[in-house]
Amino acid sequence: MGTATRRKPHLLLVAAVALVSSSAWSSALGSQTTFGPVFEDQPLSVLFPEESTEEQVLLACRARASPPATYRWKMNGTEMKLEPGSRHQLVGGNLVIMNPTKAQDAGVYQCLASNPVGTVVSREAILRFGFLQEFSKEERDPVKAHEGWGVMLPCNPPAHYPGLSYRWLLNEFPNFIPTDGRHFVSQTTGNLYIARTNASDLGNYSCLATSHMDFSTKSVFSKFAQLNLAAEDTRLFAPSIKARFPAETYALVGQQVTLECFAFGNPVPRIKWRKVDGSLSPQWTTAEPTLQIPSVSFEDEGTYECEAENSKGRDTVQGRIIVQAQPEWLKVISDTEADIGSNLRWGCAAAGKPRPTVRWLRNGEPLASQNRVEVLAGDLRFSKLSLEDSGMYQCVAENKHGTIYASAELAVQALAPDFRLNPVRRLIPAARGGEILIPCQPRAAPKAVVLWSKGTEILVNSSRVTVTPDGTLIIRNISRSDEGKYTCFAENFMGKANSTGILSVRDATKITLAPSSADINLGDNLTLQCHASHDPTMDLTFTWTLDDFPIDFDKPGGHYRRTNVKETIGDLTILNAQLRHGGKYTCMAQTVVDSASKEATVLVRGPPGPPGGVVVRDIGDTTIQLSWSRGFDNHSPIAKYTLQARTPPAGKWKQVRTNPANIEGNAETAQVLGLTPWMDYEFRVIASNILGTGEPSGPSSKIRTREAAPSVAPSGLSGGGGAPGELIVNWTPMSREYQNGDGFGYLLSFRRQGSTHWQTARVPGADAQYFVYSNESVRPYTPFEVKIRSYNRRGDGPESLTALVYSAEEEPRVAPTKVWAKGVSSSEMNVTWEPVQQDMNGILLGYEIRYWKAGDKEAAADRVRTAGLDTSARVSGLHPNTKYHVTVRAYNRAGTGPASPSANATTMKPPPRRPPGNISWTFSSSSLSIKWDPVVPFRNESAVTGYKMLYQNDLHLTPTLHLTGKNWIEIPVPEDIGHALVQIRTTGPGGDGIPAEVHIVRNGGTSMMVENMAVRPAPHPGTVISHSVAMLILIGSLEL
């Protein structure tokens, strides 16, 4: 019975991009580039179907390295011997496993990439083998239950790996069981649950189990199991949860989590989910037998409850989702160059649950503390680095859910000082009276000792001259005497080197017209002036900053413009100033050797900024006290405050009533009035001044007003229907905003019309919308006076107006009399009867006519209902020349009453199947004469009593119907009529016959043409066809 779908054989390639990259090292001379292995592809875990026709598995491994890397593989921690001709082949760095088997090849694989720099180890890849066996061949026992009960059909899937998906068949493929509120297929066990059975569930059931693997899908069917239903049990019973989710469900961050919950019950229970210690995300599916969390996070951890509810009660089940996580890097190591003899500290850190442990590898081997190396969990420390410490290092973080690797190369260097990559600048311009910094940065390992000279004079630190620890020469208060050659000397134990530059002194840059501070209003324009003088041999540029941040003049739609009239003018213009444009502006004029700057303050007045610190206190049922702190007035006094509220999460902000009604600008607290009890609110504050209304504050913390008794009566009170002896009352459930408190429900009062005693019923739950009162003494269609109020744990609300509701109806008890039926055509009969009297069982809706052929059983009768209280009906769609038995029953909403005595009727013979033939016509000046051969019926056809003719001389006009008892007809026509379309058919007791159609044309004075039914005169086909259809419809709709 198993079926499998596969793709044609191909090479399975499993690869992943390396998680942590490494950069290549360049030597000091920029010649040969040498760097250790950096993974570009790493193997991924493989699920290989045991029955697969694939002949090989490829585990990918590729590393970038110089010189190129060589590769080795480990299986279950042991290095593999990859010999020519064996089942395990090395192709590049990839491992190819030929004809893989579970016994020999299932396990954990790692790739090792090496070159002279060092070795790195790939992540682990697990090769697993998937399978799905066949279902047992034994016949399955029938499942028995009463109709109306819930039932479970077990799947009992065969041995398999990994998990399966399930569907169920009813009787035959592909008649799958639908996913609806009454049926549920557990994807955990495969079992089929039916909450409440009915007659349509009878049949044979088969479980379909499907395995989805990396590149194949296989399905198997179970033997059919028969579901037998005994007599219907109409009793109502409370929900009982049968498909339950575990008490604890473990999940990894990012996985999909599915909780299953399904219950038996009558009526079919409704399923609702809630998070006991939090709220459900609106993106989750929460009203079905499964709660799905598409991508679980730590915020989703907690206790969840499933509630199954119907009118008879409820059942609940709870379970906890525990979220854990694979390791994830917070901090990784990176490629590092270090000087010989120096100290180095590397660190890496990872998050995960459980907390990951960290270990270190050097060239693929475990690294432990020894001599100059100290390993402390996530820290690796080196003292006095030597050349032997160079190599490839890996930080490994792992917990029970996975392992991650971070790789880096350590290059320990010993180099003599070398200025070829970074010499001292050849020409060093400097401004008179200014300061110059001349770096000295030779490449050297270990770090070189640096000395400076001017000409032949060694420089020592003074008030004007300083050599910093990193070798930079600083000269202050520069004068012409400082011009000359300056040489940096660098030396370490590997050697020495020097580099020389020439210092040239230039005139200083000065601001000649500084910008002035200004006050402006929002939307104004302002120009800040800035002029400068400079050394004429050098270029001058202006830059502007606002509060020390550079101004971007190229930003599209920006507010800043600058003047480019002269090199010495750098004015700034602010267009349509906004509040954010206020602050400290700095104009800087600069050359390559020095700069000068001046500042100005711009104050922009505008509407107030948002208030802060919105706090709610003194929470009542309809009032709260709100306080806030003043925001920025933006240089214009605050005139007033406005308070707004909303109901999260999606409510709109609305202005609220306050005390005082008008809140002045110096206030920092006010009372909010007119709130709804037991409602969640957020509040915000908006300030205004003479220049406008500012931005609102951030929302306050969410609060809930205190509870109060309901203040509004439920609406939509109605009812009716149900089983005998029942009174069903319906109402519209009250929304959250009208509940005013917890413990919400409804108090129903009802009494028979005319009685003085009220009965009451308490219906808990805000979502409740109906109540069923059952009492055998309640007569059918008895009027009850009904009223309703709501309640919560703070008290009862107001009562609604009284409504009149009727108890359940019963079927009519009296049958119609004097039923008479007569065939009126070959396919129709008329039926008439005497009406029944309206009784106390309910409202009579109409009559149901049942009719069946003589010789058939009444169980095979067809039925037709009248839409009102008419006492006659025409039944169509009958067979010709056939005797029918007919009964009539009255019906109401509860069903149909007893049948009348049967009447008989026989339909007429069918009309002749031949149309009139040999049609001829003659035009005169004012009339048209048409003749045809009479139609003689066969013995099994009804008599011909006359003929109908449809005549149309204008395609835009409605055809005219003419009747005749003869085989000819003469009709008046205008003299200018040149052609017409005519249809002629028989009529009689059996109805109208098949039409003959002819297109007649006036041929000069008098003409005659004989109609040939095989080859008739034909106008444009579309004209004839479209208008023939119209004429047929017209003839059929007329009753003669």
UniProtKB/Swiss-Prot annotation:
Keywords: Cell adhesion, Cell membrane, Disulfide bond, Epilepsy, Glycoprotein, GPI-anchor, Immunoglobulin domain, Lipoprotein, Membrane, Repeat, Signal
Region (Disordered), start-end ranges: 694-720, 894-919
Domain Fibronectin type-III: from-to ranges: 610-708, 713-810, 815-910, 915-1006
Disulphide connectivity of cysteines: C61-C111, C155-C207, C261-C306, C348-C395
A single BP term in Gene Ontology: clustering of voltage-gated potassium channels
Molecular functions (GO terms): carbohydrate binding; cell-cell adhesion mediator activity
Lipidation (GPI-anchor amidated asparagine): N1012
Main location: membrane
Listed InterPro entries: Contactin-1_2_Ig1 (IPR047102), FN3_dom (IPR003961), FN3_sf (IPR036116), Ig-like_dom (IPR007110), Ig-like_dom_sf (IPR036179), Ig-like_fold (IPR013783), Ig_I-set (IPR013098), Ig_sub (IPR003599)
Propeptide: 1013-1040
Glycosylation positions in this chain: N76, N198, N204, N461, N477, N498, N525, N830, N904, N918, N940
Subcellular location: Cell membrane
Signal peptide: 1-30
GO CC terms of this entry: axon; axon initial segment; cell surface; juxtaparanode region of axon; myelin sheath; neuronal cell body; node of Ranvier; plasma membrane
Motif extent (Cell attachment site): 794-796
Membrane topology: Lipid-anchor; GPI-anchor
Domain Ig-like C2-type: 43-128, 133-222, 239-322, 327-411, 417-504, 509-603
Disease: Epilepsy, early-onset, 5, with or without developmental delay: An autosomal recessive neurologic disorder characterized by a combination of various seizure types with onset in the first decade of life or during adolescence. Most patients have developmental delay, impaired intellectual development, and behavioral abnormalities.
Family in the record: Belongs to the immunoglobulin superfamily. Contactin family.
UniProt function note: In conjunction with another transmembrane protein, CNTNAP2, contributes to the organization of axonal domains at nodes of Ranvier by maintaining voltage-gated potassium channels at the juxtaparanodal region. May be involved in cell adhesion.
Name of the protein this chain belongs to: Contactin-2
Originating species: Homo sapiens (Human)
Gene it is expressed from: CNTN2
